[in-house]
Swiss-Prot record:
Belongs to the class-II aminoacyl-tRNA synthetase family. SUPFAM superfamilies: HD-domain/PDEase-like. It is found in: Cytoplasm. Tetramer of two alpha and two beta subunits. It is an enzyme of class 6 (ligase). GO terms for cellular component: cytosol. GO terms for biological process: arginyl-tRNA aminoacylation; glycyl-tRNA aminoacylation. It comes from Vibrio atlanticus (strain LGP32) (Vibrio splendidus (strain Mel32)). GO terms for molecular function: arginine-tRNA ligase activity; ATP binding; glycine-tRNA ligase activity. Keywords: Aminoacyl-tRNA synthetase, ATP-binding, Cytoplasm, Ligase, Nucleotide-binding, Protein biosynthesis. This is Glycine--tRNA ligase beta subunit. It catalyses: tRNA(Gly) + glycine + ATP = glycyl-tRNA(Gly) + AMP + diphosphate. It comes from the Bacteria.
Length: 688
């Protein structure tokens, strides 16, 4: 009879940012193990709290089903000699399976007849299997760095304290990670019973919540935090900033969530909200509260891990903790504004960007020139772009950014505004880091875009130029920077060429670079980011590969090609023309020699080749405007009309004719046909 199954691993505090992924991987790995072991079940639910990982399997089979295993032996023609006696091959096979040749069955198919051994194998009870399945599931967790504890060589993400494995009300005995299975479960450190025994898997997780004051259901904890935080914010007339990453982290930090509201002095609101929010969210894991106009309120919401009889004391304690940090931010803000940003420019010479690439001042000089160069091409104000480039990194020398590093850029904007800098120049200091992550907002102006691209391109070309292209790790975030440049160009429709931009960045870096192939390497790298981007957007790999084969270096143009090929692929003629292009490519690849530049009309003999030649000539002229303007969708839609003459050509014309002149003429025709498509993409790479 199927029973519910429970495994709980009690540990020391698990890394909060990894808790969900650990639990999900544990469940996935364990379920895969059950499938491999052929153990049926109705479902698996994972549980995770700061000091435990658990799985509950509903209706787990009591064991494997009995089955018959068939082992095929040698063919009858090999198993017996001409006199019908068993050969050594047959005898050896039979002996290996513990039978005689006479006891073997026969397997007959339309392909022949073989000796066959049928063995009945009894299924193992689940108790003999689950400990090994669990151990393998835990061994397969995504643990970046395991640790040892005590005198043991056993490694896990954190020291393991308890293990409970129950099948119904039966304790499954065994050890995992050096800990023996027992009925003891640990509760909350400060509430409920710190240790108690569990009698049955069916009691979990309710017994843990009732007696141990631990809410093991991760999603339930998260739901409580979200609901109560929204109510708490509403109570003070605001809206809580419930960023999912922070909510997830807080959920992973508490076993018994209690949402409370605290406040801070109104005077701190004179400090830019970003600095206050940084310390609230980053340092303290608090949720800021805003009004309807997105102005920060002097309140914050936090989640306590204990249900106190005196919540006021808990609130006051948290207010006392955050107050000095906010006071620091206020002090830094007031102190930093006593000097204009531009006065800090020389100090950038004291900060190293990268040993071979120089100081941040060196980088600033390069950004300034490159931003002006880009601005000219995208019709942005050149002088303002250069001014923004010059000021871009000055806030790194301020006390605020030194203490609260994530405020770089935004504090530059505030300080520049205070200094009386142009509004768009100040904004560019903030937006230079955009986009900061996948899906993030792009810079909102041409000036900001020019500075953002200049900063990223200088880093990309510089790091590639000294031979430090990212492999496994990416310490300079070049993948993100590359995608950022591509997004800015594509989504704004800028007519920029990567070859030109990379060449200019290389020129500004000068003799600091040692990689002679830096331009080609960077283009390959950035085009590779295109592949990931379009795959995420839902475009199939073959469409992307078809465009990549042409190596277009204008990102906006690349985008038009991908969308055009995607549209073309849906046309009725697409599959046949893709196959024809592949056939043409194969034929041309086999020809070793030079082809005439033009078709000799006098050598056209068959009606089908005359028709195709005429169509190719007409199409070549008709498509010139579309190619010139990058209207690739229109071009491919027209090229789809070539399906019938192409099919007729291959049905009626022998390309590789005995007559050399005739053969070359036909190959030239096919080459011209293929070149029409290659002006957009290599559609021969499209799959069915």
């Amino acid at each position: 009879m199927a029973k519910n199954f429970l495994i709980e691993l009690g540990t020391e505090e698990l890394p909060p940012t990894a808790l969900r992924s650990l639990a999900e991987a544990f469940a996935s790995n364990f379920e895969a193990g059950l499938k491999t072991a052929e153990l049926s079940h109705e479902g698996i639910k994972w549980y995770a709290a700061p000091r435990r990982l658990a799985l509950k399997v509903t209706a787990l089979a009591e064991g494997q089903a009995d089955k018959v295993v068939e082992k095929r032996g040698p063919a009858i023609s090999v198993a017996f000699d001409a006199e019908g006696n068993a050969t050594k091959a047959a005898q050896g096979w039979a002996r290996g399976n513990g039978i005689t040749v006479e006891q073997a069955d026969r397997l007959k198919t339309d392909k022949g007849e073989w000796l066959l051994f049928k063995q009945e194998v009894a299924g193992k009870p689940v108790q003999e299997l689950v400990m090994d399945i669990a151990a393998k599931a835990l061994a397969g967790l995504p643990i970046p760095k395991a640790m040892r504890w005590g005198n043991s060589d056993i490694q896990f993400i954190r020291p393991v304290k308890t293990l409970t494995v129950l099948l119904g009300d039966e304790l499954v005995e065994g050890k995992i990670l050096g800990v023996a299975s027992a009925r003891t479960i640990r509760g909350h450190r400060f509430m409920g019973e710190q240790e108690f025994t569990i009698d049955s898997a069916d009691q979990y997780p309710a017994i843990l919540e009732e007696r141990g004051k631990v809410m093991a259901d991760y999603d339930a904890r998260k739901a409580i935090i979200l609901a109560d935080a929204k109510k708490a914010a509403d109570a003070v007339g605001g809206i809580a900033d419930l960023e999912d990453d922070l909510v997830e982290e807080v959920t992973s930090l508490v076993e018994w969530p209690v949402v409370l509201t605290a406040k801070f002095e109104q005077v701190f609101l004179k400090v830019p909200s970003e600095a206050l929010v940084y310390t609230m969210k980053g340092d303290q894991k608090y949720f800021p509260v805003y009004d309807a106009d997105k102005n920060l309120l002097p309140n914050f919401i936090f989640v306590s891990n204990i249900e106190s009889k005196e919540p006021r004391h808990v609130i006051e304690g948290n207010e006392k903790v955050v107050r000095p940090r906010l006071a620091d931010a206020e002090f830094f803000f007031n102190t930093d504004r006593k000097r204009p940003l531009i006065d800090r420019l020389a100090e950038l010479d004291q900060a190293i960007f990268q040993k071979q690439l120089g100081t941040i001042k060196d980088k600033t000089d390069r950004i300034t020139e490159l931003a002006g160069y880009i601005a000219e091409q995208i019709d942005a104000d050149v002088e303002k772009s250069k001014r923004a480039g010059l000021l871009a990194k000055c806030d790194l020398m301020t006390s605020m950014v030194f203490e609260f590093t994530d405020t770089q850029g935004v504090m530059g904007m505030h300080y520049a505004t205070h200094d009386g800098e142009d509004e768009q120049v100040a904004l560019a200091l903030y937006e230079q880091y955009m986009p900061r992550f996948a899906g993030d907002t792009l810079p909102s102006t041409g000036i900001s875009s020019a500075v953002a691209m200049a900063d990223k391109l200088d880093t990309i070309v510089g790091i590639f130029g000294i031979g430090q292209a990212p492999k496994g790790s990416d310490p300079f975030a070049l993948r993100r920077a590359s995608l950022g440049v591509l997004r800015i160009i594509v989504e704004n429709g800028y007519n920029l060429d990567l070859t030109d931009l990379i060449g200019k960045a290389k020129e500004l870096l000068g003799d600091k670079l040692t990689n002679e192939n830096v331009e080609a390497d960077v283009i390959d790298f950035m085009l590779g980011r295109f592949r990931a981007w379009y795959q995420d957007a839902g475009f199939s790999v073959d469409i992307i590969q078809a465009v990549l084969a042409r190596r277009p270096t204008k990102p906006a143009d690349f985008d038009q090609r991908v969308k055009a090929v995607s549209h073309f692929r849906e046309l009725e003629a697409a599959e046949a023309l893709a196959a024809a292009n592949k056939r043409v490519g194969n034929i041309l690849a086999k020809f070793d020699g030079e082809l005439p530049a033009e078709i000799d009309l006098a050598l056209l003999q068959e009606d089908a080749e005359k028709a195709l030649a005429e169509n190719v000539e007409v199409m070549t002229e008709a498509l010139e405007p579309a190619f010139a303007t990058g209207n690739y969708q229109e071009a491919l839609s027209k090229l789809a009309d070539l399906r019938e003459p192409v099919d007729a050509f291959f049905d009626n014309v022998m390309v590789m004719a005995d007559d050399e002149a005739l053969k070359k003429n036909r190959l030239t025709l096919l080459n011209n046909l293929r070149n029409l498509f290659l002006q957009i993409a290599d559609i021969s790479l499209l799959q069915k």
